[in-house]
A protein has these predicted regions:
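Conserved, structured core segments of small domains
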Residues: 1-140
Length: 140
């Protein structure tokens, strides 16, 4: 793999989407059955792509925005994240084709982007950038 083989995957979905409205309209028993099917499918996805998953990431909570006006609560579409390693951007994206996030659950999409080197020499030369993501440390 190249030096630029690390990718951030962001799982997105809107609480006001038609998919979420349809999900919320399901009878409780059907929704629970789909949740169980979705959890099983997600576990199978993790097992299938275990070698490519650098960090499982996880669900994301409520968002705070910080800008020149201060701190404020905001809503966004981000629901979870993961970090994967792949030989190319295209290969990283292919890992998420038909992912349960949108194939079973009411998520809308997964966006995948390369994790780039920090520009302008902000990292001390000769050191690796280490990101602690829960159980694993990812060295880029």
């Amino acid at each position: 793999m190249s030096a630029n083989d690390t990718f951030l995957a962001v799982f997105l979905g809107s609480k006001t989407s038609t998919k979420m409205a349809a999900w919320n309209a399901l009878p409780e028993a059907e929704r629970r059955a789909r949740e169980q099917r979705g959890i099983a499918a997600w576990k199978a996805w993790v097992e299938k792509h275990q070698a490519a998953i650098a960090a499982m990431g996880g669900p994301l909570g409520k968002t705070k925005k910080v800008d020149s006006n201060g701190i404020a609560d905001i809503a966004n579409e981000m629901g979870a994240f993961a970090v994967v390693r792949a030989s190319s951007h295209e290969a990283a994206a292919k890992l998420f084709e038909n992912h349960p996030h949108f194939a079973i659950f009411p998520g809308e999409r997964v966006e995948i982007m390369p994790v780039l080197p920090i520009p302008g020499g902000l990292e001390p030369s000769g050191t690796a950038r280490v990101v602690n993501l829960g159980e694993r440390e990812l060295t880029a």
